[in-house]
Every structure is written in C-alpha cells, then in structure tokens.
Swiss-Prot record:
GO terms for biological process: photosynthesis. This is Photosystem I P700 chlorophyll a apoprotein A1. The gene is psaA. Pfam families: PsaA_PsaB. NCBIfam families: psaA. Signal peptide: none annotated. It comes from Aethionema cordifolium (Lebanon stonecress). The chain crosses the membrane at residues 70-93, 156-179, 195-219, 291-309, 346-369, 385-411, 433-455, 531-549, 589-610, 664-686, 724-744. It comes from the Eukaryota.
Amino acid sequence: MIIRSPEPEVKILVDRDPIKTSFEEWAKPGHFSRTIAKGPDTTTWIWNLHADAHDFDSHTSDLEEISRKVFSAHFGQLSIIFLWLSGMYFHGARFSNYEAWLSDPTHIGPSAQVVWPIVGQEILNGDVGGGFRGIQITSGFFQIWRASGITSELQLYCTAIGALVFAALMLFAGWFHYHKAAPKLAWFQDVESMLNHHLAGLLGLGSLSWAGHQVHVSLPINQFLNAGVDPKEIPLPHEFILNRDLLAQLYPSFAEGATPFFTLNWSKYSEFLTFRGGLDPVTGGLWLTDIAHHHLAIAILFLIAGHMYRTNWGIGHGLKDILEAHKGPFTGQGHKGLYEILTTSWHAQLSLNLAMLGSLTIVVAHHMYSMPPYPYLATDYATQLSLFTHHMWIGGFLIVGAAAHAAIFMVRDYDPTNRYNDLLDRVLRHRDAIISHLNWVCIFLGFHSFGLYIHNDTMSALGRPQDMFSDTAIQLQPVFAQWIQNTHALAPGVTAPGETASTSLTWGGGELVAVGGKVALLPIPLGTADFLVHHIHAFTIHVTVLILLKGVLFARSSRLIPDKANLGFRFPCDGPGRGGTCQVSAWDHVFLGLFWMYNAISVVIFHFSWKMQSDVWGSISDQGVVTHITGGNFAQSSITINGWLRDFLWAQASQVIQSYGSSLSAYGLFFLGAHFVWAFSLMFLFSGRGYWQELIESIVWAHNKLKVAPATQPRALSIVQGRAVGVTHYLLGGIATTWAFFLARIIAVG
C-alpha cells in the first residue's frame, strides 16, 4: 500500500442545465444524425434509424457526452426493470392463487395468469389444484415470495405499488442527470470512488440489509409456515421487527440482544446463523438459516472491500498503481496502459463486465438446481427446468456480447501508437499462433467427440452392443468428475464445524430428499453417457470461442485486409474489385458466433433436461422406491445420435405435439409458430441481396403501372441488415421452439 499526501479536495463534478429539454427535437425522427434527420429517400432509412439510434459513438465523439447518455439510459433501463417487477407482483396480487399455494405447495401448482374468454381461449386455464384454474407459471416467483416472508396478496399489492414509485423515480433521475445536473467526465472516470460505493454500498449494505430482513422477517415467518400455521395467523413482518419478545420465543438468544456480539460470544447466534449444508427436508430448499449466514458473511467481506481504495484521504490502493505493478517475468509491460483503456473506452469496460456477468449467470444456472435456494423450488420441476434454461441462454448471449464490444473497442477505441509490449499488444502479435492452435483443438474435439457417437451408432446398427462405449460394454467413466464428486461428498465435518451435509446433495454420499412424494434432489451418478456429451460441450464451447476470439484479434487488420480498422466494425466486403473479402468484419464474427453459441447452449439444456428426468426427478413410494420420469434411460439411450433423436427429441415431443384440445395447447401453437419463425430466418440467410433487389424492381414496375408507387424508394436490405434479420429470427424461433417443447413436456409429466 502506498501512503501519499492527501489528494486535492473533490471539485464540483456536475454541469448545471447543460442540455435543454425539448419535445420538438425528440419528435423528429433521427434528430441525433444529420443524414437521418433529412428524412427518408429510400426504405434503407428506417433500418439506419434503428441501427444508429443507440449507437452513441456515431452521434458525437465527445466522451463526456457519450458517458452522460449511457448513464441516463441506465436509469431508463432501471425504470423498465421496476415496471416489469411491479407487473410481476401485481399479477401475484390480482390474478394468482398465491395464498392457496402457500397453504399447500406440494399439491397446488403456481399460477398468476388467468386467460380471459374473449374468443374461446379459456381452455388454456388448466386446473392447477385447489379449485383454481389458470396458466401454470414457471418463473419461481412464488418460491421467492415465500422465502422472503410474503404471506398475503395485500403485501404483493403494496410491493407492486412501491416498484411503480421507484420506476417513476428512475425515469426522473434519468432526465435529471442528463438535463439538469449532468456529471462531468472526471466523475465517470473516478474508479476508486465508484468501487467504494459499489462494493460497500450496493453489495455490502445490500447484502447486510437482506441478511437483516431474512433474520428478522423471513426466518420466523418461514418457521411458522413450515410448522403448518395458517398464513393468516402468522404475525405481520413489522410485529417481528418491533417486538423482540416475539422473536425470542422462536430464537431464545434474541432475548440477549446485541450483548453476545460485543462480548464476542458469537456462538449464541448459531440458532439462526447456521452452517449446516444440504437441504431442509420439509421444503427441499437450502436451510434459510444457512442463507442468512451467507449474506451476513458476504456483507462483511464487501464492506471491507469497499474500504480498500484511495479516494479523498491519502490512504488505500490506487487502481492505476495495482495495474501497472501487474507484471510477470514473461509478459513485458504487463497491464501498463490498461487503466487508460478502461477509463476512456466504455466498450472495453463493458466487454469485461459482460464476460464476467455471462459466466456468473451460467454459474447461477448450475447452482439453482444443485443448491435450490427457495422453499419448494426443487420439487417444482417445470420451474427448475425453466430457470436452468433461462440462465443458460442469458449467459450465452452476454458472453457473445462481450466479444462484440471487445471488437468494437478494437476498431473504435484502440490506439496502437501508445501501446507497446503490454499484454494486449503481445496477444495481438502472436494471434496467429493462438487462433491456429485453437482451430486445431476444435478439429480434434469435433472429430473425437462425434467419432465416439458415430462409433456407437454404427455398432448399434450392426447389432453389436458389446462393442459400444457404454457403462455395460467398453466403459469410458468420467473419473476426474467422479473424484471431484467424492471429495465434496466426504467434505462435511472436515471443512466447517457443525456442517452436517455437503454443499449439494448432487455430490453423492447423502440420502435423497423428497417432499410430498416427489424427489427434490439426490446424488447424481455420472457415467459413460455424461463423458460423451461432456466432450460435445467442450467442442461447441471451443468453436464459439474460436469464432469470437478471431473476430476480436483480427478486428483491426488481417493478412487479407491489412486496413480493416478503416472499414469499421461492420462492413459487407472490402469494396468492389476485391473478391473473397466479404463477411470478414468484426460484426460478421459476432453473427457467426451467435449460431455456435446457440448450438452450445442447446446441447447443454438438452443434456440437463434428459439427465434430470432420467436420473433425478420422479416420485417416491411409501416403501422408499424411486420411479424416475423416464426410468433412468439416459445412460443407455443418450450414447448414440439415434438415441438422442428417438428417445429424447421424438419421445418427449409427444406432449407438445398432442397438446391440442388441452390447457397446454398454447404450447402446441407456439411450437408450430416458432418453427415457422425459424424457417423464415433461412430465407434471409440463404439468399443474396441481388435476388431481392431484382424482385423489388419488378414489383416497383407493377406499382408504377398502376400509379400507386410510393415516394420512398424501396430497397433490398443491405447484406449486413439481411444477416441481422436472419440471425434474430433463427435464434428467436429456435429458443421459442425449445421453450414450448420443454414446458409442454415437463408440465404434463412433472
């Protein structure tokens, strides 16, 4: 740590009334661009309007102005999020069976959407139990509400109104901090202050207040609910907060107040701050006392972290010093210059944030089922499948976004003149070695992973099961994964005092947990089938990385187009007269990367869906016999391509295909419609621009003949626009098809 003389006092960091509020200006389409503001000559105008409306770099090159626009837009985003949350809570209050579900969560399904019988579509209101008819929801909101101690629909109403107030507040803040008091550039670049506020404020105090809420409100209310007390009889949250004796009846140490804390007799608090591991056998969720303890610990860590950086007082770390000291023996200048990059290029900053948030989202997907945090979440199979799928897709998109903004940084913000021998420069100088090695890895993984399946299909087709790779013939056991599982299964009692079970039941060792005759979780066995599909995961992920990384490393120049940086982030080809230079822009790499991201995530969610139905989810008899949904067929069926097609896609599609005439029929329509949207995308992806331009000119001729030709000239989509429309419909169609397939299946059988 470097101790310096105090920094000069903070200057005034806002400009007053920098930009007037003008509805006349905003009402003019394309007011942000001289060219677009002139109005349309051709139909390309509307596409350019959409492409550039939020590309603040194209409006101005003034970093301060760009920063203010981004900052203001963030408040708008928060406003929309609050509005959405309010809608969710309002549906819970107005259209849901939450109170009924709360009284019997094992036999009643969650529903917060009731279809109005306008054209006879009330068939969609299925019987979710308890005499309620509505659409079964799979968002997990009911489970979150129970975990946070919400016991009535009135409380949901109040929260919904509160969220609306916050939405309005955020809208106001977005306007205020752009038009009335706009921060100066120095404020956006003061990273130490930002770290202090975000770490100590958002994460530290945020976690602390959540831990406080859990201890004082959630834990007592959930204890009553678990004991079967009628929600209407349970004291209201404010009674627990104001009346300590009420809590002391449940947790005797509350009678002593803060004395044990100040006398360091902290073990007194172990009644409500536990470290048990495993799941609560009543609800099938993590112990809420473990979760409260976790948030308290996280709060302490982040409150400390928030005090590590040097601001107005001359004590603490400076980010620039940390980065410039970050040198290894083989990395030249190391991170020198990175501080300047990250404080002047928001694309570089965003790229890092997206990569980390995307990875974190995928980590969340894997923890939601292996350590289900909310009561009765683990036995709600449709919600479990939805949460996993949702977080996987979101994580995939965020990671592709990271590559997109890294490439935009390279094209727009990277200045090669003052970068020499730092880490980025060194990576760029040996990019050929990186990409060619990565390419070799992809070829190796592709041939070998698919080769194992093709071998199995061939042996199966020839009637030679003894020569297949399977748990019953030639075994390829995932020994490293099994070793990790065993290590974790044996960990309790060694890692933390009082820990009675491992972090997740999936590791093994523990008994299964069942709630209301349904399996919540049990040790997940891994075998040859998992080994095979794991290598498909490795293959698809490496190909996605190859495409995205090549796009970033060759964004500015390549042997084919040495001056690529001058052509920008997205361009169709390197001008006329240079054949073979189309589809090489950084944008095109993002475009291609999206398809492989889609491949990668699809295999993951298919693996998860089938594995859980085969080896985890199911019912348990009074004698303790478990019957899985697909009877454990994953290990023997998923080892051939044919098995995936026959026993997963075809066999499990029967529910969505046969859904007509039932309350699941909307999924049947979506399944059909989303296939159509997906097929529609191929029209854009498989045909060239000239084809459409010729067609349009014939159609324009016909319009002229009839004297109904429009003033705005029709134009075919540009190459880049066509590919953008194509990939959008491809992903939208593919994801919605998967959604309908998964939900119709799991709601019917789960």
